[in-house]
């Protein structure tokens, strides 16, 4: 139920279009036969910097379908030394037999159902809407976030609250998830990018 798409912005447009169709409709047609995706169907994607050769900028409508964007930085000195040690001692390979599930499918479905019960005060719904609306009126933003961003921020805030051991959302939850939810949905003006 989990699909990892590596280097999504290197895929041809036709492949990207098929991927985004299944993301939106949760089904795909192959040779005239429609296949429904499972209820936990999730797509994770990696992306190379756009300035690299052979990459294509993803259209805004397609980027908008991803819940969040998390940017990975280079490893710290200590982390890079650890990588070198693993390669030097040949312990960098992970055996599939050694991997243990962190959670069962049933537990994940239960958490998802519980997430739907996480309380969000109406003032916080207004707060989310206000944040997203501000992206549409800011002089620094050429293209603001769509209503899909509001829904994503709500869902991410509820999930984050649950991960913090709470059954209610706080303004801090929203502030925490906002950059991850918004960064790939906004197009800044040329002046703002400088």
Residue spans for each PLM region:
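Hydrophobic positions in the central parallel beta-sheet of the AAA+
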Residues: 3-4
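Canonical AAA+ ATPase core
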Residues: 7-15, 23-118, 158-163
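Alpha-helical structural signal
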Residues: 16, 40, 63-64, 80, ...
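Conserved catalytic core of Hanks-type protein kinase domains
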Residues: 22, 87, 131, 153, ...
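Conserved C-terminal helix/linker of AAA+ ATPases
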Residues: 46, 98-104, 125-126, 165-181
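Conserved AAA+ ATPase small/helical "lid" subdomain
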Residues: 96-150
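C-terminal engagement/docking regions of AAA+ P-loop ATPases
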Residues: 135-194
């Amino acid at each position: 139920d989990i699909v990892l798409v590596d280097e999504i912005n290197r895929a041809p447009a036709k492949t990207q279009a098929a991927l985004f169709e299944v993301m939106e409709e949760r089904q795909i047609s192959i040779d005239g036969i429609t296949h429904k995706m499972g209820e936990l169907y999730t797509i994770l994607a990696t992306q190379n910097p756009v300035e690299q050769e052979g990459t294509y900028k993803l259209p805004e409508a397609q980027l908008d379908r991803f819940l969040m964007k998390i940017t990975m930085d280079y490893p710290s000195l200590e982390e890079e030394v650890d990588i070198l040690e693993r390669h030097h001692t040949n312990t960098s390979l992970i055996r599939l037999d050694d991997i243990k599930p962190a959670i069962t499918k049933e537990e994940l479905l239960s958490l998802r159902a519980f997430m739907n019960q996480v309380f969000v005060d109406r003032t916080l719904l207004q707060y989310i809407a206000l944040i997203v609306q501000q992206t549409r009126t800011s002089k620094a933003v050429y293209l603001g976030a769509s209503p899909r961003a509001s829904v994503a921020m709500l869902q991410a805030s509820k999930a984050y609250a649950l991960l913090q051991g709470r059954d209610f959302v706080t303004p801090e939850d929203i502030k925490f998830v906002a950059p991850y939810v918004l960064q790939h949905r906004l197009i800044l003006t040329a002046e703002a990018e400088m």
